[in-house]
Amino acid sequence: MSTINKISTIEAIALILVVSVNRLILCLPQNILISIGSSAILNVLYISIIAIFLTLVISILYKKFSGSDIFDISEFLGGKILKNIVGIFVVIYIIFISAILIREFCEILHILYYANTHVVYLILIFIIVACIASFISECSTIKTNLLICFLMILSLVFCFLLAVPNMTYQRIFPILGNGLQETFLNGLVNVFSFNGLMVLYLIPSMLQDSSSKNFNKIAIISVVITSILLVLSTVCLLLSFSFVTSIETISPLYLLISNNQFGEYFQHPESLFILVWVLSFMTYLNIAVMFILKILRKLVCVKNIRPFVIPLCMI
């Protein structure tokens, strides 16, 4: 596996967005709606402000560690022991989250298009793609991710626009939903919707411009775009569906566009969106494997990481 030492600012932002936004395609906004009710928009705005504030605070703290990722900082603070603990935790976390997301997405594909195919075979396709990408180069993964990220965000924006005719604005009432405590206190847990921004603290050592100013720019742009997409998706789902409706195993964003058509020859636009989302999840898994391999390289101090690729993909 050939490596790439440095990435540009826009490539770094694309890496963060693909990881943090992919959950929107599944059921993240729906989970917020079910738990919070009609005050979901207020809650999402609230947690978005908190996420932006926390990102600003962390960016300020990072000024003294320009060009260092979370493992370099851990080694500085607690030596190799803390570095290894943090590294193992991050690897386990990435594997756990990736496994859940890919499983959920493959379940959606199984229900919608491949009812006669066992979901394990669908998962295997994603794993094989990630394995091949890991053997080719990180450069290819990062460059491809930049294109897929643009298509993914564009597809989400079109999805939001298509939902406008189906919106019923009375569904925002009561504005406070189940009350202030549920919206602002209990709903504070939804700030973990931004946990994909963890990637932000893995990339400083990969940046072409490792200055604190550039890191701050990447952090703010990433969290703002993620916040905007989360707010828009929540607005679309709240105004298009009743908030008490639970749509199990099928992406609510898919249902938003499934009843739209463009003329006689393009009657199923959702198929095109699914294609983009499949590419997006493949890229997501490629990135997850890439970061795990980079972490393992730091922890075990080896130059050739290829022997880890197949066992990692099997996990």
Annotated model-derived regions:
Residues 240-269:
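Membrane-interface interhelical connector segments
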Residues 90-93, 229-241, 267-313:
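Alpha-helical transmembrane segments of helical membrane proteins, especially in multi-pass transport
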Residues 34, 104-110, 127-148, 206-211, ...:
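Membrane-water interface regions at transmembrane-helix termini and the short interhelical loops
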Residues 8-27, 43, 47, 51, ...:
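Hydrophobic, membrane-embedded alpha-helices of multi-pass small-molecule transporters
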